[in-house]
Swiss-Prot record:
This is Enolase-phosphatase E1. Residues 262-284, 293-308, 322-406, 419-443, 468-479, 487-496, 511-565, 577-593, 653-666 have a biased composition (Basic and acidic residues). It comes from the Eukaryota. InterPro entries: Enolase-ppase_E1, HAD-like_sf, HAD-SF_hydro_IA, HAD_sf. Gene3D superfamilies: 1.10.720.60, HAD superfamily/HAD-like (3.40.50.1000).
Length: 723
């Protein structure tokens, strides 16, 4: 530094004007002059204090302005490239003519030689230009030292006080910061190099600025190259580098231990998880086995299920006993539900099979007619504000079937005796019933919801009518007291509430004047009209007697469901023996056959007749033809003929002259009380009203034998009840 300040810089200022004049036309001179002019302009724009300008032009007249600018830059110790270039050109001339010699300290030459011989590379990084550096070491006071130098760097690579400059040099020489040692006498440059990671040694030469204690503490300070502990510095540098590497490795290790710990934990967790997985798998397997057992139990009876559960609980470990118990308790209700459902399903299937067997024995034609009629009835009800009708079906107990069979046998054996004992009584009752049936108009078949008792009801032919009048009249009162605003009608088919022996026949359908006469052969329309006229005459003569006997009638209550009335008109079960014996008796008269007795029976579980077909083998078929439902009977007298069942469903009470029944709304032609019919409808409170016509002797035989009469229900369209 002292050499530059004392020798080089004064030499450049003294020889710059001479150099410019001697070399003005040289390209190097022209280039450096242009660079100085640009620098002056920049300083002017930057408003640097004391900034000078260089006039434009190529004449030598501007040389004095150039000299003034160089002096101003040197006074500021500026290290601009243009200034250093011009100084180097002037120094080169002085080095060539020997005017000046490059000054180096005595220890420099020996150190450079030793370091080079040791295989180390030496580079020069100076604020002076590369050319000036070379000239100085080439023309040094100790000879040519350029041979010890591997390279030169000036401010073109960057300022010496900037970190990036040193990083750029390291990149250029392909070395790491730990492998490099930077020697300088300027603390600012030392700090920049240190920031870049280089090893730094500060040289304290005579004439340099004093170093502070902090600087000495921060850096290694030496006074000569010989004092530089290069080996130790290199070792320390290597050690430092190694230390840095070790530190970095430790830092990496410090970062890695958690990973290793995690790995250990993972390994530990893996073992723990393996154990837990094994434990979890066992309950899972048990649960699976439990599920399988539960499924098997659902298919098996409840007793088998209990055994499986007990075996599973015994096989389970004590630790899982509570869980298994809980699962078993949860599975039990489901199994019971499944068992009950299976049993109920089996029962339903059995009933369906029975229904199918009964249905197969019936003719297809009545079914189709009934289905069509039912469909029409549903459409009519959907259009009008009709009420919902529910039907509750109950299975027929086996005991009822057995009673029916026994009663059939009793009827077969004692039919003749019964006919003889009650023949006289029946004749009288039949005669009394004739005028009542003729006098009672068809309009009275409609049951109203008022509490006024029916004063004129047809006579009931029943052996139990006299025995139990008090019992059945309260029931009739209850039926009439039912509210007329009923919105739903339920048809409940239940087992008979009274024994089969006490089956009663009531006349609840006073439409005898509308029914055809029951004869072995159907009478023509003219005879029917004639018979009706005669009956009306007789009815007028005996009003008092008819009224008195009508009061003794014990009928099953019929509950009105707001405009809906259901009546039953089905064929009466007949016995071949009775038919033969009754046909042979001379006491029978043709007028008796003309008599119409309407019988109403409580729906019984013992009856199993649909559409006129009975299980005892004697059958009648009620075949609806063109709106008529008539009982077709063989003419040989083997079976009792049933009169035409004419049911008015329009509620006008007028019988039809031709015996046609309003079948358009009839949906119960195939109903039975014993087997639930597919299209059956009935009345509320579990009872149906049956309208059946039989000759007097046959009816008497049925009453004595306590025979259950089959009934079918025929719903009528809504009729507004009189309030």
């Amino acid at each position: 530094m002292r050499y530059q300040q004392d020798t080089l810089f004064p030499y450049a200022l003294k020889n710059v004007e001479e150099y410019l004049k001697a070399n003005w036309n040289e390209d190097a001179t022209k280039t450096v002059v242009a660079a100085l002019r640009e620098q002056a302009d920049e300083d002017k724009k930057a408003e640097v204090e004391g900034a000078l300008t260089i006039p434009a032009g190529d004449s030598e007249d501007i040389i004095p302005d150039i000299v003034k600018y160089v002096e101003w830059q040197t006074s500021r110790d500026a290290k601009t490239g243009s200034l250093k270039t011009l100084q180097g050109l002037v120094w080169a001339k002085g080095y060539k003519d020997g005017s000046i010699k490059g000054h180096v300290y005595d220890d420099v030459s020996k150190a450079l030689e030793q370091w080079t011989e040791g295989g180390r590379k030496i580079y020069v990084y100076s604020s002076g230009s590369v050319d000036a550096q070379k000239m100085l070491f080439e023309h040094s006071e100790q000879g040519d030292l350029v041979k010890y130098l591997a390279g030169h760097y000036d401010t073109k690579i960057g300022a010496k006080t900037e970190k990036d400059s040193y990083e750029a040099i390291l990149k250029n020489i392909e070395a790491t910061a730990e492998e490099a040692l930077f020697l300088t006498d300027v603390v600012a440059e030392a700090k920049a190099a240190k920031e870049a990671g280089l090893n730094v040694v500060v040289l304290e030469r005579p004439g340099n600025a004093e170093l502070s204690e902090d600087d000495r503490k921060e850096f290694t300070v030496v006074k000569s190259f010989a004092d530089i502990p290069l080996e130790s510095i290199v070792e320390s540098a290597n050690g430092a580098g190694a230390k840095r590497k070790i530190d970095e490795a430790q830092e990496e290790d410090e970062a890695q231990p958690p990973t290793k710990v995690v790995k250990k934990d993972e390994n530990g967790d893996a073992a723990a998880k393996k154990d837990e997985t094994a434990k979890v798998d066992e309950p899972a397997a048990k649960a699976t086995n439990g599920d399988a057992a539960a499924k098997e139990e659902a298919a098996a009876p409840a007793e088998g299920k209990m055994e499986v559960d007990e075996a599973a609980a015994a096989a389970a470990p004590p630790a899982d006993a509570a869980e298994e118990k809980k699962e078993t308790e949860e599975a039990k209700p489901e199994t019971e539900k499944v068992t009950e459902k299976t049993e109920s399903t089996a029962a339903e299937k059995k009933e369906e099979d029975k229904k199918e067997e009964v249905a197969e024995s019936k003719e297809a034609a009545p079914k189709e007619v009934v289905a069509e009629e039912a469909k029409k009835e549903e459409e009519v009800k959907a259009a009008a504000p009709a009420e919902e009708v529910k039907k509750v079906e109950e299975p027929v107990p086996a005991e009822a079937k057995k009673v029916v069979e026994e009663e059939k046998m009793e009827v077969d054996g004692g039919a003749e005796a019964v006919a003889e004992e009650k023949e006289a009584e029946k004749k009288e009752e039949d005669k009394a019933a004739e005028p009542a049936a003729e006098k009672k108009p068809a309009e009275e078949a409609v049951v109203t919801s008022t509490e006024e008792p029916a004063k004129e009801e047809p006579k009931v032919e029943s052996s139990t009518a006299e025995a139990e009048p008090a019992k059945e009249k309260p029931a009739e009162a209850e039926a009439k007291a039912a509210p007329a605003e009923t919105t739903k009608a339920e048809v409940v088919e239940k087992p008979a509430e009274t024994p089969a022996a006490e089956s009663m026949e009531t006349d609840s359908e006073p439409s005898a004047d509308k029914e055809a006469e029951a004869k072995p052969e159907a009478k023509p329309v003219e005879e029917v009209k004639k018979a009706e006229a005669e009956k009306k005459v007789e009815a007028e003569k005996k009003p008092a007697e008819s009224e008195a006997e009508a009061k003794e009638v014990a009928t099953k209550p019929v509950e009105e469901t707001k405009g809906e009335e259901t009546t039953t008109a089905g064929p009466v079960e007949e016995i071949a023996v009775e038919a033969k014996e009754d046909a042979a008796k001379p006491e029978e008269k043709k007028s008796d056959a003309d008599e119409v007795s309407t019988t109403t029976t409580t729906t019984s579980t013992e009856s199993k007749t649909e559409n006129g077909t009975h299980e005892n083998g004697v059958s009648k078929e009620a075949t609806p033809v063109n709106g008529k439902e008539e009982s077709r009977v063989p003419e040989n007298g083997e079976a009792e003929p049933a009169a035409e069942a004419v049911v008015t469903s329009n509620g006008n009470g007028k019988h039809e002259e031709k015996g046609d029944s309003d079948k358009e709304n009839d949906t119960a032609t195939s109903n039975t009380t014993e087997e639930p019919a597919a299209n059956g409808n009935g009345v509320e409170n579990g009872s149906t009203t049956s309208s059946t016509t039989t000759p007097a002797p046959d009816a008497a035989a049925e009453i004595k034998s306590k025979k259950v009469i089959d009934s079918s229900t025929t719903p009528t369209p809504p009729i507004e009840a009189e309030s």
